[in-house]
Amino acid sequence: MVICNAYYLEKRKGVNIEMKIAVCGKGGCGKSTVTSLLAKALARRGKEILVIDSDESNYGLHRQLGMKLPRDFTDYFGGKQNVLNDMMLSKFTHQFFEETWTIDDIPEDYYSLKDGVKLMSSGKIHQANEGCSCAMGTVMTQFIQNLRLKEDQFALMDMEAGIEHFGRGIDNGVDLILIIIDPSYESLQLSKKIGELSESIQKPFYYVLNKVTKENQEMMYEAVWNSSRVAVSLSADPSIMGEGLMGKELSEKPDAIENLTEFLLSI
């Protein structure tokens, strides 16, 4: 099931675009999987891709991309505690807000690169009692708002599970929101809330139905808050699930991801 309007495909054919995309959803719905597969598909089309790991609890995205985990970007600003101290003094936001970034500006020590895909990480929780993730959220909020893309560049943000990032204002800096839905009541309910939040900040959003089977496809489609916003249905693929389980680089090229890629390039 794909919403891929032929009019827009023809209208935008050959047009160079740039886009910042937030990939959202509940924990375990497949955000990292879709982000990885989409990044690879865009890169195969000659686009320059920045993947932003914005989930402090996720230790698998870099492996799905076949890369090493990059150094925490928060360290570039002196580390979590330094950022928190500056936040208390209202220095950090003022300083960082005035600084614009491009993909080329990201210091080499803070990204991994493979096959046209550059990966950066806001930061991870590395040990017990080290504090909250507010510093990483502040860094990402300012970074994505001040990131300037060139033609044929895409930034894909693999967001933390849930909707806290909306409260932090991170999504204000993106151009489009992808909401991943798995076959569960919790995922469907959260996707409705994310859709409402997206509309409240005037951001276009689309649904990706994930882990779809013949038995649940119709049920999922009918249960979605706004079915006209369903972009694609991604079938439950044993090969993808197996590679993810073993922490291997994803090698599959699902038709649904190819269709999603063409759809995003058309809007």
Label every model-predicted segment.
Residues E98-Y110, L119-M157:
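Cytosolic-facing regulatory segments adjacent to core modules
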Residues K20-S54:
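Walker A/P-loop phosphate-binding motif and the immediately C-terminal alpha-helix
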Residues R44-D115:
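N-terminal phosphate/diphosphate-binding loop that engages ATP/GTP or pyrophosphate donors
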Residues R148, G167-S184:
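Inter-motif core of Ras-like GTPase G domains
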Residues V2-E18:
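Short, Lys/Arg-enriched N-terminal segments with co-localized hydrophobic residues
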Residues A43, D171, E199:
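Gly/Ala-rich phosphate-binding loop of Rossmann-like dinucleotide-binding domains
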Residues S121, I179-D182, V208-N210:
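Conserved beta-strand segments of the P-loop GTPase G domain that flank and frequently precede/overlap
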Residues A6-Y7, E196-I267:
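C-terminal lobe/tail of nucleotide-utilizing enzymes
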